[in-house]
A protein has these predicted regions:
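Extracellular receptor-binding modules and their adjoining Ser/Thr/Gly/Asp/Asn-rich linkers
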Residues: 1-137
């Protein structure tokens, strides 16, 4: 299931697919640690087109456009299609209030597009959901 375009970016550690990343002072990326941090993107395991790949093992495929699976901070049953989300602790996404969207529109990581059921998804069950939700970035 190929749903997004990624750019390989240098990371601190090895963030798992579905984790939200923020930039450090040196330009390396790391998992978000608090709500409303300015995020760069979400690590993807469903990409179909990639840019910037090299043999460097500290590179992660970061979704730049399309749909990507992301770990929710709150209970996933509280998310609805169309909800805007921001970075949250542990590299997760959090629901944004209408007030937060007005004050910090630049902090929107994406918009919820699907809350999948089951453990896998795709024609051949090739995508492991692992409690994640789909967002459009």
């Amino acid at each position: 299931m190929l749903t997004n375009v990624v750019e390989y970016r240098k990371t601190i550690g090895r963030p798992a697919p579905g984790r939200v990343l923020i930039a450090t002072e040196t330009g390396e990326l790391k998992e978000s640690t608090k709500r409303l941090e300015p995020a760069i993107g979400v690590v993807s395991d469903t990409y179909g087109l990639e840019f910037g790949k090299s043999v460097d093992e500290n590179l992660a495929p970061v979704a730049m456009a399309g749909r990507v699976l992301a770990f929710p901070f709150e209970n996933r049953e509280g998310f609805r299609i169309g909800d805007p989300v921001c970075a949250a602790p542990g590299g997760t996404v959090s629901l944004m209030t209408r007030e937060e969207v007005k004050i910090w529109p630049d902090r929107i990581v994406g918009v919820v597009t699907e809350i999948p059921g089951g453990l896998t998804q795709g024609k051949e069950n090739e995508v492991y959901i692992n409690g994640r939700i789909w967002i459009k970035v």
